[in-house]
């Protein structure tokens, strides 16, 4: 256990250094020498192999498991605690009878800037990792299309948008970034927690609203609010200090942060959901044993399905607990007022998406993205890209 602990500390330090130097090296067009040990364990060196060859054969039970290294999603939320971490540390060893295992750390505790995750996967600094789709808005805006603010008022709509976009997403990541997309996870609905009363979207005029993506910023600014970008870990402090009047975050993750004690009104319209891509550096992926790749191809879709089902449950549970449901634990039970989403607000959501969010995304993304949209999500949702933006 001591060896494992020391290895993890060195690995986390390596990730931090990789993130730091990766941006600098890539800015000059170089390939970064990995700051980590090789992505997966390799065969013994020739001298070791000679010794092993002379030694008596060991049983499979005595052999060390083949170990992967994974960077996961956000720490301290259900997706990581209940699904990602147990899958890699418990389910994988169980399904492989102990032959395969993995070490995993959440990216926000590994010194890895979220916006650099895809680049670090591309370089191989991170061999296997979870990429928050919203973090790609600046460098890779085209990949954020399925979860633009105001596009998906419910999970059925989100599934439809992702299904239409996924073939393009997987192909483009493989061909342009050398990254293999293996699963797409989802967080609970991202909704509004406010410290002051509101009756609907129009009441956001003049308020400072915490957001986590450019699309969310476009949406709230179109309503007359001021968008404030704040890391997830700083949301509660920003609400408590009065730096923001409202915060967009997950229904249950907001509860975990204690927002049910810091805010008074909950507006449950999903502005976004929060998609995350679990992906692998292609060389690291192809370097895995074939039977491990087969196992992961079979089991990761099952993990994905479980996470999506849990996100829907967590969305409902978060709303219930924030508003004082007796079925929730006392420490989770809030006293927030639940603001109903009116038909007028839903029409306004659709208008803002078509006239503000989608055109601004196209401005950031470029003209080719209009073509991508019109070949994927646009026809699936009946939302063609505007001809001028």
Q: Each PLM stretch: what is its role?
A:
Residues 24-28:
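N-terminal signal peptide c-region/cleavage motif recognized by signal peptidases
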Residues 153-176:
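Short, solvent-exposed loop/beta-turn-alpha elements that line the ligand-binding surface or hinge
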